[in-house]
Amino acid sequence: MRWPPWASDTQAQQQSRKSSSEDDERQAAASSTTTSKKKDWESSVTAIDWAAFTEARTIIPTLILTSGFLGAFYIHRRYLRRFPDAVSITPSYFRRRSLLGQVTSVGDGDNFRIYHTPGGRLAGWGWLPWKKIPTSKKELRDKTVHIRLAGIDAPELAHFGRPEQPFAREAHQWLTSYLFGRRVRAYIHRPDQYQRAVASVYVRRLLDFPPFRRRDVSYEMLKRGLATVYEAKIGAEFGGEAMERKYKKAEWWAKLRGVGLWKDYRRNKTKWESPREYKTRMGLEEAAQPGVEIKK
């Protein structure tokens, strides 16, 4: 306010200072109030409401999501995990579980390769665009499981400089026509020293009678005289004593009828040679050559 002309300068100055001091106090009080409100707001924002984590609306969805994730992981690891080769098969499969796959090649009368298709058609193999089974050798390289049929020994084809055994080609051709391109189930017993999985293999075929009946491939070969019962004392796998007796009975019946490799057995017993005897003889002949491994 304006002071009268007769007022002294000292009174005017005192009043001005008093007014200025009051303004400063009001501003300080307002600033303090604002700061306090800001701190209260920040505290409310950053504070953790621990009680909310114990409420049912929080616990139930969390349990459902966690259980679903763990369940999906377990199912994938146990049922949908694909093995690219025999070396990758975990020990939990040996003598307990099986592999489902499609036969991509047949190397001999008692071994072949499958492309592992866990879950089969139910998991999309063969009809989903991203689950097609490769067909070319380049695509299949390092992606197939090498299977050795359990319980049998088929005649040897010519390889590693060794001559072909009688009925080796017939056994190979039959196994190729019986399995190539088909889905098989292999019950894994163990791995062998050649990075193969020794397995009892079963297949279902439309043209068999009765159709789609599960067939034991090893048994079918023994019955037709295309293989002998595995004779090695170490490393023999049959899938149990009952299967061993069944295989020996099938071999005895084929020998009695003189079918397949048993055709000339009675007339020429002294020169007849089983696959086991053939490999033993070849091994003895190659004993002088270091680094040569005898195939089992």
Curated annotation (Swiss-Prot):
The active site is at R148, E156, R196. PROSITE patterns: TNASE_3. One of its GO terms (cellular component) is membrane. Its EC number is 3.1.-.-. Residues 97-264 form the TNase-like domain. Keywords: Calcium, Endonuclease, Hydrolase, Membrane, Metal-binding, Mitochondrion, Nuclease, Transmembrane, Transmembrane helix. This is Probable endonuclease lcl3. The lineage of its organism: Eukaryota, Fungi, Dikarya, Ascomycota, Pezizomycotina. The gene is lcl3.
